[in-house]
């Protein structure tokens, strides 16, 4: 199959890295050749695949080598569970420089060194947070990733973030081939969560590609720095990640999204009881005062 390059975006703390690594493990289990490129200075995008605390990053290795030109591919690329290739872009010290620059440096380095080999089926970019700014937009902006998946939940801020990311996709879609492949709902067990995310997906012109239920086995696996696929392959949650992998494998619905207005989003939240109809008299009042 032709190489498919996918980027996973979503609000910080929503479970992007965990979801991505479990999805990738399921694809590897199904015989697919996959590379993960972590695009987050925290460098935690590959820890469950490699069973490690944090992988050495391209930026760290380039700094210690003197320059990127002195780096070799084997210095930064490690092989983990199921033969998955793992790379972390890394970033500068907190408060110094642009972390997005690490993403640009890493992807350019990987291309120059032949990391995107012909045998690869998928490359997944696990991208920091909900900002689609300069460096972090690189997988979209430079047409590296053709498919974007947004991890969200039924919480208000996760939905706002998903809508903002959709706006970023629109900005670059008209000048390139990037498309939204769908929303992945990583459940927080909020009320009517699956219905709400399906409604949000319909509102912005995409699909909820899969609803991943909340299960403590994910945390049990993470403590051991493992994916659920590897830690407990017979668990129901492992089958959820396999189902997500199959849906992405077979996904043909790649769209330029139509982001919702703030009013539309608030109406949706009111419809599902997440937000009360606006009443100026209660704004800023504590619960006890109401």
Curated annotation (Swiss-Prot):
One of the record's GO molecular function terms: metal ion binding
Annotated residues for binding of ATP: 10-17
Keyword annotations: 4Fe-4S, ADP-ribosylation, ATP-binding, Iron, Iron-sulfur, Metal-binding, Nitrogen fixation, Nucleotide-binding, Oxidoreductase
Modified residues (ADP-ribosylarginine): 101
Cofactors required: [4Fe-4S] cluster
Enzyme Commission number(s) of this protein: 1.18.6.1
Gene3D superfamilies from the UniProt entry: P-loop containing nucleotide triphosphate hydrolases
Cofactor binding note from Swiss-Prot or TrEMBL: Binds 1 [4Fe-4S] cluster per dimer.
Post-translational modification: The reversible ADP-ribosylation of Arg-101 inactivates the nitrogenase reductase and regulates nitrogenase activity.
Keyword DNA damage included in the entry's annotation: no
Reactions that this protein is recorded to catalyse: N2 + 8 reduced [2Fe-2S]-[ferredoxin] + 16 ATP + 16 H2O = H2 + 8 oxidized [2Fe-2S]-[ferredoxin] + 2 NH4(+) + 16 ADP + 16 phosphate + 6 H(+)
One BP annotation, GO: nitrogen fixation
Source superkingdom: Bacteria
PROSITE patterns according to UniProt: NIFH_FRXC_1, NIFH_FRXC_2, NIFH_FRXC_3
InterPro entries cross-referenced by the UniProt entry: NifH/chlL_CS, NifH/frxC, Nitrogenase_Fe_NifH, P-loop_NTPase
Enzyme class: oxidoreductase
Residues that hold [4Fe-4S] cluster according to the record: 98, 133
Function: The key enzymatic reactions in nitrogen fixation are catalyzed by the nitrogenase complex, which has 2 components: the iron protein (component 2) and a component 1 which is either a molybdenum-iron protein, a vanadium-iron, or an iron-iron protein.
Miscellaneous remark of the record: This subunit is associated with the vanadium-iron nitrogenase component 2.
Family statement drawn from the similarity comment of this UniProt entry: Belongs to the NifH/BchL/ChlL family.
Complex formation: Homodimer.
Protein name: Nitrogenase iron protein 2
Protein species of origin: Azotobacter chroococcum mcd 1
């Amino acid at each position: 199959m032709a190489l498919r390059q996918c980027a996973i975006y979503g609000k910080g703390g929503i479970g992007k890295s965990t979801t991505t690594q479990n999805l990738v493990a399921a694809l590897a289990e199904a015989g697919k050749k996959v590379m993960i490129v972590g695009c987050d200075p925290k460098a935690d995008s590959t820890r469950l695949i490699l069973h490690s605390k944090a992988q050495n990053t391209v930026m760290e290795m380039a700094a210690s080598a003197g320059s990127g030109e002195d780096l070799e591919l084997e210095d930064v690329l490690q092989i983990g569970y199921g033969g998955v290739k793992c790379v972390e872009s890394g970033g500068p010290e907190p408060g110094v420089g642009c972390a997005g620059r690490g993403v640009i440096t890493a992807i350019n380095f990987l291309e120059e060194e032949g990391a995107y080999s012909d045998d690869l089926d998928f490359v997944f970019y696990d991208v920091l947070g909900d900002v689609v700014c300069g460096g972090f937009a690189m997988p979209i902006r430079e047409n590296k990733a053709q498919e974007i998946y947004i991890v969200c939940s039924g919480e208000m801020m996760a939905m706002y973030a998903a809508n903002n990311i959709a706006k970023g996709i629109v900005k670059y879609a008209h000048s390139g081939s990037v498309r939204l492949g769908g929303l992945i709902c990583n459940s927080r067990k909020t009320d009517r969560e699956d219905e709400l995310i399906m409604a949000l997906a319909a509102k912005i012109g995409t699909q909820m590609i899969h609803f991943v239920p909340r299960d403590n086995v994910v945390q049990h696996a993470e403590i051991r720095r493992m994916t659920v696929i590897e830690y407990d392959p017979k668990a129901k949650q492992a089958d959820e990640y396999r189902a997500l992998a199959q849906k992405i494998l077979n996904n043909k619905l790649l769209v330029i999204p139509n982001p919702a207005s703030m009013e539309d989003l608030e109406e949706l939240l009111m419809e599902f009881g997440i937000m009360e109809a606006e009443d100026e008299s209660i704004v800023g009042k504590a619960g006890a005062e109401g």
